[in-house]
Swiss-Prot record:
Species in which this protein is naturally found: Neisseria gonorrhoeae
Binding annotation for ATP: G45, V46, T47, G48, S49, G50, K51, T52
Compartmental location: Cytoplasm
Protein known as: UvrABC system protein B
Short motif (Beta-hairpin): ranges: 98-121
Nucleotide-binding found in the keyword field: yes
NCBIfam families tied to this protein: PRK05298.1, uvrb
Family per similarity comment: Belongs to the UvrB family.
GO molecular function: ATP binding; ATP hydrolysis activity; DNA binding; excinuclease ABC activity
GO biological process terms, semicolon-separated: nucleotide-excision repair; SOS response
Start and end residues of each Helicase C-terminal domain: 436-602
HAMAP family xrefs: UvrB
A GO-annotated cellular component: excinuclease repair complex
Length: 675
């Protein structure tokens, strides 16, 4: 693999092959648009044309920090993994919601039912979020892969940066001052339980486990009131990794604020509370008056004593000092001025960003109206779409089917229709609806004999269920993918399809963006002539594209009439086919079937870096169980960490070290943020 470093760029691109097909033209076009100052561009890239690789080349050549937005965690994880492969020496970060489970605070007036906020925070994703903001503030070579979590409020970047602890060998500082600063940054003192976001004191030595670090801790050795040396070490084994001259410890939460800001916020909250009490008194609503006073005074007491309280995010406007209705600080405020934004699958992601605010606002309004929260809680919210537009840096929309918004805003459209592999868009066949079920049956049998897979998309849940039952009774190995299936199980089903555990997958609207299944040679669209969201020309092109990764790809549209959407989808697919066929003929390319390994089962070996210290685990192969995506990995890591800590308490240090290496192994293989 060639490693390429462009002039004036901090990125090192690990290039498995040079750009080919339409990629060189697309890369040059996007770079020219960026240098010309175009605010918006569109990369119209067909399925399998290597859009992610094009993005990586644009980032590497421009030398600018980048944020890539995806519309769900699964796609974000896929992009994150690919970017880690292209930029293993740079800071590729993952910024998604850190909740494994989240029940927001809500009130149902009709039943007089108040639902307390309940959530389970995923520690590993929280660490990755903190790592993302730290690297945005300290490095130039940063690529953030994010979901819409990026438009939700987090702490103010200015306040966050003021709360850091910077230490340097030779500095004069008292031990008690270091401890006081760490406590103000919400680090816990844990002399017995040394974990992420904590510190311990042993004589003149302070060990700090930074909140954003996945596996390194900092040892501050003092001599009187002078910092004698700084070392990075393994928090489990205690083995030293390297000596550092200086280090910056960042706060353990995005919501940490200086003491004077907390006191200022408390005064502002008191003033708003007084106004709200007067309002409910005038309205003669004593229950709401007592409720808001009791709840807010309790929170104020916690803020005075501890510096934070449960639900502190509802007071974010008072902490940031913003006026009513002003946008909250978000990840977008942490981005440097020269950043680039890529919005992947923009025809879905842009719409999703636009819809986040309204759902949040209606829930908050009830809490305010009935005295559970102060009116300022409404400003703890995601960005409105027009606010998001104001903070968007130079943006590239990436989609095979750009929507109306992209078409209206694109300064230029760069096409990436030709695939380097030579694969041609699927041949489209239109057949009558009357015999669709039996006709499809014979097509399925043909594919099964060739060892290929089939995707079938229907219009309704009932139709999908009946079709699945019918084919199952006829001996076809068929599964049904529907909206009730969670992300983990969905990934498992797709993996099983690729492995050949079944041959046909039936779905409704789940067989579109982000499904990378080279084994699928037939996509069947039932009732293709029923105009609507599921049969719009964009939906049809996306669904047809699922067969574009197979050399024998065919799409059958069952319809009794040709609708405008069908005509647009067929014409666009034919245009792309002709362009690819012409390219193949000119360059003597014979389309080759993509042979993509099913990577979901990890069986790897962890090799500790050659540092002269520690031991090499190369000969001790560690087999990891079936891990399909980030959720599986996180569960496995949590289980292994519990076992590792128990082994350490039982003084079984060798066993603990093996478990530690398993955890690292999972992180490295799934590219989860091992540093």
């Amino acid at each position: 693999m060639e490693v390429i470093r462009y002039p004036n760029s901090p990125f090192k691109l690990h290039q498995p092959f040079p750009p080919a097909g339409d990629q060189p033209t697309a890369i040059a076009g996007l770079l020219e648009g960026l240098s010309d100052g175009l605010a918006y561009q569109t990369l119209l890239g067909v399925t399998g044309s290597g859009k992610t690789y094009t993005m990586a080349n644009v980032i590497a050549q421009s030398g600018r920090p980048a944020i890539i937005m995806a519309h769900n965690k699964t796609l974000a994880a896929q992009l994150y993994a690919e970017m880690r492969e292209f930029f293993p020496e740079n800071a590729v970060e993952y910024f998604v919601s850190y909740y494994d489970y989240y029940q927001p605070e809500a009130y149902v007036p009709s039943r007089d039912l108040f639902i307390e906020k309940d959530s389970a925070i995923n520690e590993h994703i929280e660490q990755m979020r903190l790592s993302a903001t730290k690297n945005l503030m300290t490095r130039d070579d940063v690529i953030i892969v994010a979901t819409v979590s990026a438009i939700y409020g987090i702490g103010d970047p200015t306040e966050y940066q003021q709360m850091v602890l910077s230490v340097k060998e030779g500095d004069t500082i008292e031990q008690r001052d270091i401890i006081a600063t760490l406590v103000s940054m919400q680090y816990e003192r844990g002399d017995l339980d040394f974990k992420r976001g904590s510190f311990r004191v042993r004589g003149d030595v302070i060990d700090v486990y930074p909140a954003e670090s996945s596996e390194n801790a900092l040892r501050i050795s003092l001599f009187d009131d002078e910092i004698d040396r700084l070392d990075m070490f393994d928090p489990l084994s205690g083995s030293l990794h390297q000596r550092v001259g200086r280090y910056t410890v960042f706060p353990s939460s995005h919501y940490v604020t200086p003491r004077d800001t907390v006191l200022r916020a408390c005064e502002s909250i008191k003033e708003e509370l007084r106004e709200r009490i007067e309002f409910f008194a005038r309205e003669q609503r004593p229950v709401e008056q007592q409720r808001i006073e009791q709840r807010t005074r309790f929170d104020l007491e916690m803020l005075y004593e501890m510096g934070f309280c449960k639900g502190i995010e509802n007071y974010s406007r008072h902490f940031s000092g913003k006026k009513e209705g002003e946008p909250p600080p978000t990840l977008m405020d942490y981005l440097p001025d020269n950043a680039i934004m890529f919005i992947d699958e923009s025809h879905v992601t842009v719409t999703q960003i636009g819809g986040m605010y309204k759902g949040d606002a209606s829930r908050k309004q009830n809490l305010v109206d009935y005295g559970f929260r102060l009116p300022s809680a409404r400003d703890n919210r995601p960005l409105k779409f027009h606010e998001f537009e104001k903070v968007m840096p130079q943006t590239v929309f990436v989609s095979a089917t750009p929507a109306k918004y992209e078409e209206e805003h694109a300064g230029q459209v760069v096409e990436q229709v030709v695939r380097p592999t030579g694969l041609v868009d699927p041949q489209i066949i239109i057949r009558p609806v009357a015999t669709q079920v039996d006709d499809l049956m014979s097509e399925i049998n043909d594919r099964i004999q060739k060892g290929e897979r089939v995707l079938v998309t229907t219009l309704t849940k009932r139709m999908a269920e009946q079709l699945t039952d019918y084919y199952s009774e006829l001996g076809i190995k068929v599964r049904y993918l529907h909206s009730d299936i969670d992300t983990v199980e969905r990934v498992e089903i797709i993996r099983d399809l690729r492995l050949g555990l079944f041959d046909v997958l039936v779905g409704i609207n789940l067989l579109r963006e982000g499904l990378d299944i080279p084994e699928v040679s037939l996509v069947a669209i039932l009732d293709a002539d029923k105009e609507g969201f599921l049969r719009s020309h964009r939906s049809l092109i996306q669904t047809i594209g699922r067969a574009a990764r197979n050399v024998n790809g065919v799409a059958i549209l069952y319809a009794d009439k040709i609708t405008d959407s069908m005509k647009a989808a067929v014409d666009e697919t034919e245009r792309r086919r002709e362009k690819q066929i012409k390219f193949n003929e000119e360059h003597g390319i014979v389309p080759q079937q993509i042979k993509k390994q099913v990577k979901d089962i990890i069986d790897g070996v962890y090799h500790e870096e050659d540092s002269g210290k520690g031991r090499r685990q190369g000969k001790n192969k560690v087999k990891v169980g079936e891990i399909h995506n980030e959720e599986d990995a996180i569960k496995e890591i949590a289980k292994l960490e519990k076992a590792m800590q128990q082994a350490a308490r039982d003084l079984q240090f060798e066993e603990a070290a093996v478990l530690r290496d398993r955890i690292r192994n999972i992180k490295e293989n799934l590219l989860f943020g091992a540093e």
